[in-house]
Amino acid sequence: MRRLSLPPRPNWEERLREVGFTWYAPTPTHPVPYWGEDACYAFTPTQIEGLKRDAQDLTNMVLEATGAAIEGGRMRELGIPTFLHDAVRASWDRDDPTVYMRLDLAYDGSGHARLLEVNAQTPTSLIEAAVSQWQWLEDRLAAGEVAAGTSQWNTIHEGLSEQWAYLARERGVTQAHFSSAREVEDIATVTYLRDLAGAAGVSGSFLAADEVGTSPDQRFLLDTWTLPIRHLMWLWPFEYAWESRDAAFLSNTETRFIEPLWKAATGSKGLLAHLHERYPDSGLVLPATLTPGSLGENVVRKPLYSREGQNVTLPGQTQTAGVYGDLPVVEQAYAELPTFEAEDGPRYPVLGVWVAGDEVCGLGIREGRSRVTDNRATFAPHVILPVQ
């Protein structure tokens, strides 16, 4: 595993915009470029094969731990409010279908990957991983800037397409509403998912998350025309929804969510402790606990639900800023990320492995400027070098 420097493509910004990726530049809330045009991470085929095996094993373990937590009545430990327990259990018992999730891993090129956390319900950086880095590779190959035979671990687009086709073919999903916050990245992500669904036979329309309606005399959530929403592809965190004024509707609506309501368990960082409990000898699962202090001092403390590295405490450091500081926490054994030097300082990459349904399908990398991956992280493409 190496970090390679490359000159920017002459028209790289235009190329990103062509595939719907428009948030690549720095902003006040993301003060560094979100897309890394000047470097990539390189792996050997053997390293990627090992990552695939590790990530698939972790996917299986995560889903098994999810089912055990739900069926064992341990959802309170995961931070899921009591009024939702029956609905989450019903979603699991129905086997409500899933489209995707992302596993975030620590890996330095040797040995096994280790699970840092699971982005189960609202994973982003999807267009970057599925489309933009593939376009980047094609451009680099065409320009002769990488060796012939260079490839990527990237069948994300194909995997998601097949998963939508499965929902249409086997699960009766022929129409869905697609919804997100009114943010450029979120809208682009659900638009991409809607395009994939449409190609697979699932028609769809967009509405903003704050436009999803409720009515006491309706069994379903409602769209802006007050028509029933039967399937909702909702890029909106369940933990936001269950704290809203309409939270009670989550527990009794007949609207089926994509991602399903059972993903509230998968997405809780408390599941990291359940994973360690179930698989204490796995080299892929870091020790973790819901009892602070029981693992000693060399731990990372994380709220059960948090985003962009907020309210995370590394060993010997103060807590990062954020809005999740009042939530219960999980403590996880500290796994040091590898360090790679860039011209303007060190980079600490986290490997995001994408899962379509229950099958791993590709890799995306975000490199932070600190050991907590936060809003100063940059997406970096990757390559698999040909065997010499």
Language-model features: locations:
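Preference for protein termini
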Residues: 1-388
